[in-house]
UniProtKB/Swiss-Prot annotation:
This is TELO2-interacting protein 1 homolog. Disulfide bonds: none annotated. It holds the Pfam family TPR_TTI1_N. It comes from Homo sapiens. Regulator of the DNA damage response (DDR). Part of the TTT complex that is required to stabilize protein levels of the phosphatidylinositol 3-kinase-related protein kinase (PIKK) family proteins. The TTT complex is involved in the cellular resistance to DNA damage stresses, like ionizing radiation (IR), ultraviolet (UV) and mitomycin C (MMC). Together with the TTT complex and HSP90 may participate in the proper folding of newly synthesized PIKKs. Widely expressed.
Amino acid sequence: MAVFDTPEEAFGVLRPVCVQLTKTQTVENVEHLQTRLQAVSDSALQELQQYILFPLRFTLKTPGPKRERLIQSVVECLTFVLSSTCVKEQELLQELFSELSACLYSPSSQKPAAVSEELKLAVIQGLSTLMHSAYGDIILTFYEPSILPRLGFAVSLLLGLAEQEKSKQIKIAALKCLQVLLLQCDCQDHPRSLDELEQKQLGDLFASFLPGISTALTRLITGDFKQGHSIVVSSLKIFYKTVSFIMADEQLKRISKVQAKPAVEHRVAELMVYREADWVKKTGDKLTILIKKIIECVSVHPHWKVRLELVELVEDLLLKCSQSLVECAGPLLKALVGLVNDESPEIQAQCNKVLRHFADQKVVVGNKALADILSESLHSLATSLPRLMNSQDDQGKFSTLSLLLGYLKLLGPKINFVLNSVAHLQRLSKALIQVLELDVADIKIVEERRWNSDDLNASPKTSATQPWNRIQRRYFRFFTDERIFMLLRQVCQLLGYYGNLYLLVDHFMELYHQSVVYRKQAAMILNELVTGAAGLEVEDLHEKHIKTNPEELREIVTSILEEYTSQENWYLVTCLETEEMGEELMMEHPGLQAITSGEHTCQVTSFLAFSKPSPTICSMNSNIWQICIQLEGIGQFAYALGKDFCLLLMSALYPVLEKAGDQTLLISQVATSTMMDVCRACGYDSLQHLINQNSDYLVNGISLNLRHLALHPHTPKVLEVMLRNSDANLLPLVADVVQDVLATLDQFYDKRAASFVSVLHALMAALAQWFPDTGNLGHLQEQSLGEEGSHLNQRPAALEKSTTTAEDIEQFLLNYLKEKDVADGNVSDFDNEEEEQSVPPKVDENDTRPDVEPPLPLQIQIAMDVMERCIHLLSDKNLQIRLKVLDVLDLCVVVLQSHKNQLLPLAHQAWPSLVHRLTRDAPLAVLRAFKVLRTLGSKCGDFLRSRFCKDVLPKLAGSLVTQAPISARAGPVYSHTLAFKLQLAVLQGLGPLCERLDLGEGDLNKVADACLIYLSVKQPVKLQEAARSVFLHLMKVDPDSTWFLLNELYCPVQFTPPHPSLHPVQLHGASGQQNPYTTNVLQLLKELQ
């Protein structure tokens, strides 16, 4: 709070200080004065303003050299006084302005003085404070012609500082001060709004500075990006505000044709400018050059705030100077249109706001409306578009397409004037087709196969994102920037929204038919045209535009859909028909013992991958992409039509399901995504809901097409996809079709077996999922290595049981005799015995009908029929079919596990072929067959005991013994070979099989002998773990023999006889010396304790 509130009190305090400063001009005296001033109120300072200013001004005007520090102190003190008071006299304002400006001028060199940065900053702030302190209209009286030389000097001084100084702080301060001098200050209520006469007077005055200001600011704006965005933003703002004020159409039209004689001295009169038509024309031409240069630089500036200020520049100049800067209209509009799709949302929003403003104001540039200028620009751009797309880099393409998109947004429905020109439409379509050409040389697209039918499963929850957000990533020949593709899609959508849809669809359909080279690009464009025509996600700047009629849109979609799904465009070659030719090479060394490494498999893969020339791969890639684009199109059509797409489901759903079952992974994924788009559009909760609701139509189509399989070879895939994505409610509907499939398989087993077996696999997988077995019929044997290894930390259950009773022994012997009969092949006796022991069902005493077995459930009947076919196909010459058949057979056993009377006879039939697969087939088939063996052992173990011990166990044991030395010597790469995987699978499966089949002592010894060598630490770690799991299972069957066998390998303790009459026990492993088996044996013995 001020101490001295009245002028009298303040004068008494300030007078001695002012007198002292007048006598002696030192920094200390100035600082003393400023200290005293801070204790005086503003009102008192206002009364004593000139008295206080006198010693300060006297110090500045004293002739002779002065120290910079003194001048800086005086200027800072002067600024403090001006910030607390108002200047109410014009003469004082002008004198102070001159005195402050002179602080930075060197009379000797007639150039800006070489002073410190601190002094420069102080003077700039002083000038700014002085102009703000001008009271009321005094500021306007300052800008009279007589001030022109002094004002010009200050403007030149500030421009020089802004352009040449290295200090960013001084640059920004100089630009802000320049804004104040040109009455462009951002602060509120300064200055007040000007009337027409005042605007004209100031415009005439400022016109003298326009050349210097515009050229200097242009140099600043187009300078190095490193100078900082704030300097460029300030320069841009001063540039367009100055130009739009001086060149404003409203001012220039009031300029009289006869120049009035100025009432000023001759020297000043020479500096003044008369803004007549000739001057406007010449100045406009020069400004056009500068504006083009600014646009070229600023439109690609990395900082968004600079680009945003460019939008303000365009708006200001086009709204205020559309007549005086008529030549700038094109470049300015081009800049604005190019920023419509800027990456910054703030710039996009501002651009759209400005464009709407232009539309509301109906801006006229010269004698042309804005729409006419845009149409001419679009014509010109369409003409040069093919050349630009062919010659520009990615950034150039992005800028050009942004420009095209902006023109389309602005013109709206008026783009039809361009599209109705055949030449321009052809050039536009040629450019789009050219730039959208795909790169189809990637071999991975063909290589990626959907080997596992589980890939057909789709999540029941559909994504909330728009279909085009999930479009498959693709690679183009002529660009790599993903933003360009997004721009191209937006261009096509806007064409579909505003353009004549019938004309565009007909034109691009003609290109679709014209050449295979154009087909993919034309399909992409057609997809986006439909999406745009629906008006979804299209930003409409023209509120009166009428969207395409839904019925017309549906008709157009129907015609495109028919073309997409036609025979010649839907069923294209996407893979080599002989892709399984390498099977004979796989069979070169049959049997388990032949698998020593994976090199033969590698050779086959290499042979297959490079057996066809590159053009064939390119053509297949091209076909794959065409199908994917058409599938994506169906999804986009569904999104565009919404519920109306339900009317097209009859023609669209079946073909899409065919492709969802395609072996090419890319096609299958895109088709599944398309089905999810259809679900969302038509109001279905999930794919399951979609399929179940349309199953009658689909089943009818499958049944009809199976009768003409040669014409419809993809029919089984539809049923396969249906089964993968439905529930048990579908089974009664497809039961007849399944019988048709089996009948057709019997007829075409030598030609179409692969596709039918895939269907059977999907069917059995679905049945296993829909009808799980609820009884306690044994554990599933497909356990991972981790599950097997977990037994190492558990005590065997057999060792934890309570003491065995006499009844347990009796029951054990009875079970043993019964199982012995079964093992000898007495299946019928076993069945009869089971029937005798079963409790007869209760019947009504009055019912005299003979006993009739209840009919088998539908899924059991189907599983039996399928298993019969699989038994016959187990010996197929095609390896891939055999592998699939083994998978199906495994699932059949799972489905039939609760109906032993049906399962056991079929297992008996399948056994010879299964043994052949286990012992004399390719390694992959052996692996798959062993999986089936484990499942059989789990579901009907007693039935397999003798067969397994006789036909399979010797070969398995022999294979393990033979391979053990190889795996012990192998390096880390060995774990990736097929031989290793087969060893691992056998070791993991032997333990559960031995336990489930309850093998005898001799057979258990065979297993133990074969697995002992894998307890060596020289073996791979995973094989050691699997071998330990075998012995953990053997402990449950025969713990005594297992304990003895392990101690024979390594015995950690010496056994002392409990009585001297007993002979000491000598075990081979009791030598005390450790061996390769010690570690694993100790772990296993610990489990037995």
